[in-house]
């Protein structure tokens, strides 16, 4: 993701803050005096874990997942990261997932080629932030482009890899159209995988906003060493703002996270976080859901995860800040994770994941192509 340094939501976020009765000094105070219930308020340091650039030179790290249990070539406590760009920095052309240990050792978990997709996902390979790990299977969004621009992108697919990094299954069609982000809820022998789709009418609109972004729930069944199978697909969210962008590739619903059955969505284009109730079981779309929070410290929210205390953590595309929002919708803490460029940190942040035992927060820094830790 490479938002223009003058990304429009910078101004929009500030204006929304003023409209909510928050001045810039108030926002600074909120950052300095994090509420006692804040998760990120307990951390005061950031450090580099490792470069995310593998031997083939892939750039622009997106998805971040912490491995919960060892299986195959996946090792407990390690972090897997998907790359969206190739060595020429063309978006929608990255083909690798790297595995990084907490001490910074990096290896290639998977290098996905077009041949491995066997014609079931035309257009090439471009791995998004839609990265999940369920029952030992890695599922990653593939949203490829021929030249780094959304105008030449394809609908893509979800690529299913086993714990050794081998492509075993492809999920495509049935509403999967530009899979931009994902999250999952596991249960015994099954999982609900939520996928944000951002290519519904965006190419034809040629940069204009269309409200056709969707969130799909894929209900998957698992049986031994066989790849997961789709038991059903439900559209649980719809009507999200989306558009193509020459710098950001696309702007649309991005980060997803589930807590107690509620799906939280980073509605990037509208500069807000929304909540879809009963997402794991519902049979109909909730539209864009209810608004949890908007404006304030948000500035084009992208990556999203849920903190151990149940708060929603998002990172901005329009600046280098992380924002923590309580379950009641109050923005309880925020801080800069990157201040490079102008505006500070714009376009640097994307995927994030809570470290084991809540000991910190892993996040990717696209500006430096690194995995970092807030601790």
Predicted regions and their residues:
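Short loop/turn segments immediately following the C-termini of beta-strands
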Residues: 84-86, 143-145, 153, 187, ...
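Surface-exposed loop and turn segments in beta-propeller and other repeat-based domains
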Residues: 35-57, 99-125, 157-180, 221-248, ...
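A short loop-to-beta-strand structural motif that recurs across blades of beta-propeller domains
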Residues: 95-98, 156-159, 207, 211-216, ...
């Amino acid at each position: 993701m490479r938002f223009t340094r003058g990304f429009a939501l910078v101004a929009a976020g500030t204006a929304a803050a003023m409209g909510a009765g928050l001045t810039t000094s108030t926002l600074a105070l909120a950052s300095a005096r994090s509420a006692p219930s804040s998760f990120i308020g307990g951390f005061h340091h950031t450090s580099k874990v490792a470069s995310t650039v593998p031997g083939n030179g892939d750039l622009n790290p997106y998805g971040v997942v912490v491995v919960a249990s060892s299986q195959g070539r996946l090792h407990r406590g390690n972090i897997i990261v998907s790359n969206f760009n190739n060595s020429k920095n063309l978006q929608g052309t990255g083909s690798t997932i790297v595995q990084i240990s907490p001490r910074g050792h990096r290896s290639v978990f998977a290098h996905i080629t077009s041949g491995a997709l066997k014609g079931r996902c035309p257009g090439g390979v471009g791995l998004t932030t839609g990265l999940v790990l369920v029952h030992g299977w890695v599922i990653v969004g593939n949203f490829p482009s021929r030249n780094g621009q959304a105008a030449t992108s394809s609908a893509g697919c979800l690529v299913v890899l086993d714990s050794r990094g081998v492509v075993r299954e492809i999920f495509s069609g049935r509403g999967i159209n530009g899979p931009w982000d994902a999250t999952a809820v596991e249960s015994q022998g099954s999982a609900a995988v939520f996928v944000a789709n951002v290519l519904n009418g965006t190419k034809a609109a040629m940069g204009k906003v269309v409200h056709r972004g969707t969130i799909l729930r894929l209900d998957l069944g698992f049986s031994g060493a066989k790849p997961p199978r789709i038991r059903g697909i439900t559209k649980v969210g719809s009507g999200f703002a989306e558009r193509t962008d020459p710098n950001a590739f696309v702007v649309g619903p991005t980060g997803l996270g589930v807590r107690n059955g509620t799906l939280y969505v980073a509605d990037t284009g509208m500069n807000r976080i929304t909540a879809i109730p009963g997402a794991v079981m519902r049979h109909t779309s909730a539209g864009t859901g209810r608004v949890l929070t908007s404006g304030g410290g948000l500035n084009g929210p992208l990556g999203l995860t849920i903190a151990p205390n149940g708060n929603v953590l998002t990172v901005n595309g329009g600046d280098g800040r992380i924002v923590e929002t309580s379950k009641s919708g109050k923005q309880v803490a925020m801080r800069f994770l990157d201040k490079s460029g102008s505006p500070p940190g714009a376009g640097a942040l994307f995927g994030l994941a809570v470290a084991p035992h809540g000991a910190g927060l892993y996040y990717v820094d696209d500006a430096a192509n690194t995995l970092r830790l807030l601790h």
